Amino acid sequence: MSTLLYALGRWSYRHPWRVLVAWLLLLGIAGGSAALFMKGTDNAFSIPGTEAQAGIEQLSRSFPQASGTSAQMVVVAADGHKVTDESYSSAIEHTVSSIENLDGVLAVTDPFDKMVTGLVSDDGSAAIVRLQFDGQATAVSPETKTALKDFGAELQQSLPEGSQVAVGGDLFSQSLPKISIIEAVGVMIALFVLIVTFRSFRMAWFPLASAIIGVALAVSLIFVATAFASISSTTPLLAIMLGLAVGIDYALFIAARHQDQVRAGVGPEESAARATGTAGSAVVFAGVTVLIALIGLSFANIPFLTTMGIAASVAVAIAVLVAITLTPAFLGFVKGQVVGWKRRSRSSRSSSGLARPEPTNDAATEESVPARRSAPAKAKRGFADRWVTGVTRHPVVTTVAVIVGLGVLAIPAASLRLALPNAGMQPTSSEARQAYDLTSEHFGPGFNGPLIMTGTIVTSNDPLKLMKDLATEIEKIPGVKTVALATPNQTADTGIIQIVPETAPDDPATADLVRELRAQHDRLLDKYGVDLKVTGFTAVAIDISDRLGGALLPFGVFVVGLSLILLTIVFRSIWVPIKAALGYLLSVAAAFGVVAAVFDWGWLAGPLNVDKIGPVISFMPIILMGVLFGLAMDYEVFLVSRMREDFVHARARAGGADRALAVNAVRSGFTASARVVTAAAVIMFAVFAAFVPEGDASLKPIALGLAVGIVIDAFVVRMTLVPAVMALLGEKAWWMPRWLDRALPHFDIEGEAVERELALHDWPEPDTRAAVVAEDLVLAEGDIELYSAASVRVEPGDSLIVTSADPRAARALLLTVAGRVAPTGGRLRVAGHLLPERAAWVRSHVGVALLDGADDPVAELRRAVRGGAPIVVVDGADALTSTAVRDRAAAVLRDAGSPTVLVSATDPDLARALLAEARRSGTAVLDLSASALPSEVLS
């Protein structure tokens, strides 16, 4: 992958206008499509397979008047007045008759109707007008909502001064999130951090511009998707938040690597290609981990959450693609002007501001002025160097302090409560929130979240008495304040019971009441013969919260298990992945603890503009776990991969490893990567934190959790706990069983393939024209070597016969040359392309004919040469036993032009006969049975 990214980076650098115009064109198409086809977001939460959802579906079929969404108008009389006064009751009745004509309204309940009870408060200070709509909240038109609010405003004006009217209910329980100026502050902070990091205004704009283009494209595609999918209003904002954060960071990693290389003297074009191949490989790996975690949200089996995860993963995928293409393109615009201003050296100027003279090595001067000789000044150590030295010098104290500290910070997480958003979570300036609070104050909190029980009563001879008896039974259950309604439908085949709980819809006691009502199912079925289901908006919200709570453990096992597997593959270590996974769990627990302390305990609720203390949105934990997992892996990879690189190089130089060498590698690797990781973490924190003060009530706890989680994971876990634990483990940190090392695949996330290509650029000679060059090639399976020390050179148009007592060895060598099998040692270049790095190109340009066991060997050979492959490998020439078959095969090779042919056979004479008949010269023989001795060129 790194070699492909290397080529992509070079191409993007050379053609910056093409890349930029291509992305802008895609953005224009997506934006135009969104403007034409988008249908708006949908906040209707549903959860198939639950009792609440089944109840709603049953009501929609048999009792549609009760299955749709509802709203309510709360009227509160002025002090000293009652709503039963003529000035109030007449105005309310007039409003009720006006509302009945609204489009989509099925029924309006007059609180003064003699058939209705409970809609006028006990003290007469307030009344509720209930409205029932056709369909769910998303089916009600914006015009109807606006008209309903207008009726409320007109009623307010007609009532005596001091009275209050507020419109709310389920229809208005969801607020539409919006972008405020505060979010722009996060972007400006990110720009400032980029300027400081790059020490260049020009370079600072590149990550920001690429991230904005990627986010705009992702959001446009999300709105296009609303034309054929149900997408919640929180989804675009989540995509913006994630897309900005990872988009800026991914471009930062590539641009920072490029700047360091240019400062070191690498040419700008070569540097852009290398940065894309090396840092870009890590970016792709990091992006894939985030994608997997987001797609893993489908574990909860909740459609809207699955859609949210997919939409957010699209934003991350686009951020990766933009980073590896648009970033090198931006670098191509400025060429070599990326170094930035020089860091001011404190030792280069005197206190008076005059430059100090540079030290001289002139021996004569030193001898003539011996009194002025002094020891050279020590280079000033950076903060990162001093920090990691202190951490690794006291690893036990550091480890214990971090674990205990994060454990204490996680304590509030035990009290974290979850619920779907309702009007009570909206700002106090919201009319829906005012209606919610007025209802709670005058009628009790349960009136904001009534429950519905419904069932088929077609077998009853007296449906009215049956519903009355059921209401009496249910009113006895603890937690039920009153049964507001118990009635059959017009056809008397379905009954509905509306229950008002004593507690608010997001109170845990209401969830307990739902479970208790369901626990009464069998008893009521036996006694009354009615199969009752508990449903309604509140019950659906509780079911979703329960489903999400149940999904946390399997999702946690998924992401932790995934981190163990991925990091084991990347770092070839057992202890590093375990340490990383445990660190991730500490970060998540601490982030949960901070969110609970703010939203449940009320700490810093005022400064953070938290309007209501209470439960947080149900899908906050699973989204926080998924996103933080991907970001934590980012920091782990960028920090620890540099430590591993330094350790491997130091071990090779020293011929072995000990604890001191391993600790030095931890320190040097940390110091080399701390600047970029620090900048990336600060940027992510700024972007996430900007969504907290004025953010949507649903997004606010997610943004706070991510902001805190990023700070804790980057600075406390990765940059403090990780080096301490690595110092404790010493050289054992990089231990891995040999059998596991052989079994696991290799991921090149640090661009080792690019580095190898650069190192072997002139091997075997600059601009070689050889078709195949192999030097000390080895292929082993476990402890068994299929072949070893295979060295050969074949020029274009020549041939090679590979022979061995074991046909598997010859076939393995040919498949290695064809790019189908990766060698385990040695060097190999095919048609100018180094293997295994360029195996994809070789596979598409080298034909393979496996004659042994083929039904028609000639047809197999014909298929291999089809398309004009410049190199053809033919395994098992022994299958061409008859002269006639061999002649036909030779004719196929002749007709193919002049490809380079590599043939394997246990009997080399058969292969010679085939090649002679094909009129080929310059044939070499490689005998793998003789320890792959140098090839013999035959005349």
Predicted feature residues:
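Helix-to-loop junction immediately C-terminal to a conserved catalytic motif
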Residues: 818-819
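A short helix-turn-beta junction within AAA+ P-loop NTPase domains corresponding to the substrate/partner-engaging
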Residues: 913-934
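Loop/turn-to-beta-strand initiation segments
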Residues: 868-871, 895-904
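Conserved beta-strand
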Residues: 774-777, 785-795, 826
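Structured non-transmembrane domains adjacent to transmembrane bundles in polytopic membrane proteins
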Residues: 49-70, 79-166, 415-604, 637
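Conserved ABC transporter NBD signature motif
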Residues: 823-834, 842
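Short hydrophobic beta-strand immediately N-terminal to the Walker A/P-loop
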Residues: 800-803
